[in-house]
Amino acid sequence: MAAPTTSPTEIEKQIEENIAKSLAEIPHPALPQGTNIYGSTKIFPDYQAEAGETYFTLVHGIAHESSVSFVAILQATRALRKGFESAIYFYGPGAINCVATRGFPTTGDSGFPGEQNINQALATFIKEGGKVFACRFGLALHGAREEDLIEGIIPAHPLDVQDALIHYARKGAIINSTYQL
């Protein structure tokens, strides 16, 4: 094997020069903070609920594995604020979104920014009048207990998933079903 032709010091110097060159290629910040980079025209009307309308959300998504569960909660909250009767049903692995025991190093702490977003969003949804159901079997699959649930979340029998869907469909609910593998 041939001996290196450049010393570690020369390599480090070349790396530093390349970093400086890379940083200088595009001016930063490219746009000042607050610059609009997207239009703001809303295409559809800002619909509000008509008397008796219902919005039902099914969530089968794992907390923090993607934004699926969090966005579903935000959508259900928006529907609630538009005047819809709004309910969320967490089933399967989605049930673990409902635990109050999330946190690191202690319950309620955020081990990373946003760790408590789901808990806080669910507490807000419940406080504003939304109903939240959590499948007991989904909880059991992940070692969560009913006493671990966020206050106000309603534990539900596994067979209630289908019957809740039938119930809300018969009420004419708009049904938002999310699913994550």
Regions found by a protein language model. Name each.
Residues T106-G138:
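A glycine-rich helix N-cap at a beta->alpha junction
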